[in-house]
Swiss-Prot record:
Lineage: Eukaryota, Metazoa, Chordata, Craniata, Vertebrata
Protein name (database record): Delta(3,5)-Delta(2,4)-dienoyl-CoA isomerase, mitochondrial
GO biological process: fatty acid beta-oxidation
Main EC class the enzyme belongs to: isomerase
Positions bearing Phosphoserine: S268
Positions of the record's site feature: Important for catalytic activity: E197, D205
PTM-bearing positions, type N6-acetyllysine: K327
Length: 328
């Protein structure tokens, strides 16, 4: 134990000297090392099918260490969102949120397109033949359905792990609701985005009208897309800020999305997940409120051993991917 204490003190002194330097003799930094080697074990997750995720409408694989790949998996139906999908997405992302081995997620569509949106044939009975004896009861029934469908994409936004949408082909209707709940969006050159709901006689009600204005920051463009249901092609999506990168085809895009997820997963999970929480809070609150929130947040997060490990790697010119961070 004495040897361990001495080693910790030596590391603290080393970091303090490296960080402060001779130009700032009055600056002192207090760093603590906690935990044991048992807390720092590398993840033993095998690549391939994720055993805890078995679904009808989704396929979940361990694409790389700490990275899960979620595919919308109804290619013969253009990945249309049926009743099973709405339930399984909630189950899937609730599991991912609790998965200490997962640090980043990529979501894509199998087959020729990302998604055709809501499967109207499968869901017609819920929408066109709602249950209830009178207007009040029918209204409460429909409201319950709408809020449950909203939860399908809320769980993506709430997931503490960054979620990267990789879009090819059509991203129609509910697909726009889905990707606007993600943290990062990539697309292939053949992608297009379409707020389709107005063409089927309703207002989008599971996230697009609430999130898209904040994603692209252009209310006039949002109004145009929502009122007309016109297609937004890949280059326009890039110019508007809906996506951050466009790639020649699906294969190149998926490789890039998985590489990005791997890079994110190499960082401190405490830092990454804290960053996501604070970015979402800041989106919906004032600067003053958000600064106060992050101050309260970091009063505990600054005590993480991830800080010490990251600083040590930096001072020793090591890449962060060589650092083993504890599970979170």
């Amino acid at each position: 134990m004495a040897a361990g204490i001495v080693a910790s003190r030596r590391l603290r002194d080393l970091l303090t000297r490296r960080l402060t330097g001779s130009n700032y003799p009055g600056l002192s930094i207090s760093l603590r090392l906690t935990g044991s080697s048992a807390q720092e074990e590398a993840s033993g997750v095998a690549l391939g099918e994720a055993p805890d995720h078995s679904y009808e409408s989704l396929r979940v694989t361990s694409a790389q260490k700490h990275v899960l790949h979620v595919q919308l998996n109804r290619p013969n139906k253009r990945n249309a969102m049926n009743k099973v999908f709405w339930r399984e997405m909630v189950e899937c992302f609730n599991k991912i949120s609790r998965d200490a081995d997962c640090r980043a997620v990529v979501i894509s569509g199998a087959g020729k397109m990302f998604t055709a949106g809501i499967d109207l044939m499968d869901m017609a009975s819920d929408i066109l033949q709602p249950k209830g004896d009178d207007v009040a009861r029918i209204s409460w029934y429909l409201r319950d359905i709408i809020t449950r469908y909203q939860e399908t994409f809320n769980v993506i936004e709430r997931c503490p792990k960054p979620v990267i949408a990789a879009v090819h082909g059509g991203c129609i209707g509910g697909g726009v609701d889905l990707v606007t709940a993600c943290d990062i969006r990539y697309c292939a050159q053949d992608a297009f985005f379409q707020v389709k709901e107005v063409d089927v006689g309703l207002a989008a009600d599971v996230g697009t009208l609430q999130r898209l204005p904040k994603v692209i920051g252009n209310q006039s463009l949002v109004n145009e897309l929502a009122f007309t249901a016109r297609k937004m092609m890949a280059d326009e999506a890039l110019g508007s800020g809906l996506v951050s990168r466009v790639f020649p085809d699906k294969e190149v895009m998926l490789d890039a999305a998985l590489a990005l997820a791997a890079e994110i997963s190499s960082k401190s999970p405490v830092a990454v997940q804290s960053t996501k929480v604070n970015l979402l809070y800041s989106r919906d609150h004032s600067v003053a409120e958000s600064l106060n929130y992050v101050a309260s947040w970091n009063m505990s997060m600054l005590q993480t051993q991830d800080l010490v490990k990251s600083v040590q790697a930096t001072t020793e010119n090591k890449e962060l991917k060589t650092v083993t961070f504890s599970k979170l």
